[in-house]
Design a protein with these regions (language model features):
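Extended, subdomain-level signal for the structured scaffold at the beginning of enzyme domains
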Residues: 2-92, 96, 104-207
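Aromatic-residue-lined binding/catalytic grooves and analogous aromatic/hydrophobic interfacial grooves
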Residues: 100
Length: 207
């Protein structure tokens, strides 16, 4: 995203300091991309003083991306301020994206017509099988895969667990897991932005 010249801001439900998941600081998650962030004082400073969701103006962003991790299941699922922001961003033709469990923050989002944003959309994210393999199925608050299907989403469940993949459809981009955040999700978001720019240039409405 930086290479394409996109500016990035980081917000959080309550604002302020955002702690990092200790497990994510270890192998295999501590890859070169993660190290570059941890070694950058400028980037780490973004996590120390984040604005709260309620202060974000949806009209000033071309895309919003929800970070993953199991904490998203607790922090995002029933956050009405986040859901209102996502709906506003999506309905004005901007991109909504997620990585891993970040898609839990999208599942309960309703659009102005009362429908669920994910209804009829292709999406992906951690499966229930993967939660069982990770021995956390008894610790998480719900089955996100099942909830996605209940909301009418066309959920993609890969045969091989933990593979890196992404799905993009009509302004919604979802990455299967945190390993999908780099080239896959970021590239898909850029492609969606290019597609929307092309439609706007032709005078067409985004789908």
């Amino acid at each position: 995203m930086n290479g394409r010249g996109f500016e990035q801001d980081i917000a959080s439900p309550r604002g302020g300091d955002v702690p990092l998941d200790p497990r994510s600081l270890k192998f295999p998650f501590r890859n070169e991309s993660a190290k570059s962030w941890l070694d950058s004082q400028e980037r780490m400073a973004l996590l120390k003083n984040t604005p709260p969701i309620r202060s974000i103006d949806p009209n000033t962003y071309d895309a919003i991306c929800l970070a993953g991790g199991h904490g998203a299941m607790f922090d995002f699922t029933h956050n009405s301020e986040l859901h209102n922001l996502i709906a506003s961003v999506y309905e004005r033709g901007a991109i909504v994206a997620s990585v891993g469990h970040g898609y839990c923050g999208i599942l309960n989002v309703r659009l102005s017509d009362g429908s669920y944003l994910v209804n009829g959309k292709i999406l992906t994210g951690p499966s229930w099988r993967e939660e069982k393999l990770a021995l956390v199925s008894q610790k998480v608050p719900y089955n996100a895969e099942e909830l996605a299907k209940e909301r009418g989403a066309d959920y993609i469940r890969w045969k091989r667990p933990y593979r890196s993949s992404a799905a993009a459809t009509n302004g919604l981009v979802t990455g299967h897991n945190n390993s999908s955040s780099g080239d896959l999700v970021a590239s898909s978001v850029c492609e969606e932005l290019d597609r929307l720019d092309s439609l706007k240039a032709k005078g067409s409405e985004p789908l």
